[in-house]
Amino acid sequence: MTTGKPQSFEKMRTPFPGRSKAKGPQSDIIPSAPPNTPVTEH
């Protein structure tokens, strides 16, 4: 399971495997950006 590092990383950072794969990394960053990083505060 050492070669599956990229796969496990994608599954961890992407709560929606079907949506993140269809839209891409942006769909994962959009919902994870506001709650994780204070964009409105900056």
UniProtKB/Swiss-Prot annotation:
**Which stretches are tagged as biased composition: Pro residues?**
32-42
Span list, region Disordered: 1-42
Name of the molecule in the record: Uncharacterized protein SPAPB1A11.06
Q: Which organism is it from?
A: Schizosaccharomyces pombe (strain 972 / ATCC 24843)
